[in-house]
């Protein structure tokens, strides 16, 4: 399996941001790490191995990036306003730096699929829902899609525009909403076992239903924990469905 790493100083984030790409061809998959982890987390925990068949057969080219969660939502020393400012800067980093790199390698019209587990599911879903004109869809695993609990009741525009549970409820425009209503690749999946919060996925699904946005909500069994062994089953399962479309 081809594996390429690169890094550059992000003008949006003010720090070096490494990236790893797996594969020689295929549909681009942008991967957001869990919690405060780094761009190699999915390799260390064998999630990349779980989708190796798709990569080696030229169906998927996977791009894994760093998160900024340790500077934003998970930084208990930071003011909530700074936490969400970092999320907005991260969004600009994706759109202005990562997406052009992917399109340079996969074609100028490429619309990547996003994915992530746990806190990575929030980032993957948020990126897609904010930019459905530039991304194809999302496979969000074991996520929670309301950031308000991290912010000590703080509120500003950055909170609103980085919180899918907020902005999707009020989406009523003639640009983004029609595109989302044509979606064919939104997957919201979670287990119902230890440390999972299936009600968070159901909440997001209810919002999407209220807006007429097609999606797949799947609640795996009560034995399915918030853990790697299950994400290694979920991602190849839904990538298989995506590649058959």
Descriptions of predicted regions:
Residues 1-245:
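Non-catalytic cap/lid and distal C-terminal segments of serine-dependent acyl enzymes
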């Amino acid at each position: 399996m081809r594996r390429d790493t690169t890094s550059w100083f992000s003008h949006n984030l003010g720090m070096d941001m490494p990236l790893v790409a797996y594969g020689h061809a295929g549909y681009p998959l942008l991967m957001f790490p869990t919690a405060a982890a780094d761009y190699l987390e999915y390799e260390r925990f064998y999630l990349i191995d779980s989708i190796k068949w798709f990569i080696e057969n030229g169906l998927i080219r996977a791009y894994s990036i760093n998160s900024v969660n340790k500077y934003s939502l998970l930084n208990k020393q930071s003011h909530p306003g700074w936490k969400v400012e970092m999320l907005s800067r991260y969004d600009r980093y994706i759109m202005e730096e990562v997406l052009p790199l992917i399109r340079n390698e996969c074609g100028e019209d490429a619309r990547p699929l996003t994915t992530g587990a746990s806190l990575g599911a929030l980032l993957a879903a948020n990126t897609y829902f904010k930019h459905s004109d530039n991304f194809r869809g999302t496979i969000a695993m074991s996520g929670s899609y309301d950031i308000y609990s991290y912010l000590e009741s703080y509120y500003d525009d950055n909170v609103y525009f980085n919180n899918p549970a907020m902005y999707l409820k009020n989406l009523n425009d003639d640009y983004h909403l029609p595109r989302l209503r044509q979606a064919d690749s939104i997957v919201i999946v979670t287990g119902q076992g230890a440390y999972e919060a299936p009600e968070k996925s159901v909440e997001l699904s209810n919002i999407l239903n209220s807006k007429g946005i097609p999606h797949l909500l799947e609640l795996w069994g009560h034995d399915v924990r918030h853990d790697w062994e299950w994400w290694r089953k979920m991602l190849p399962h839904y990538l298989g469905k995506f590649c058959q479309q």
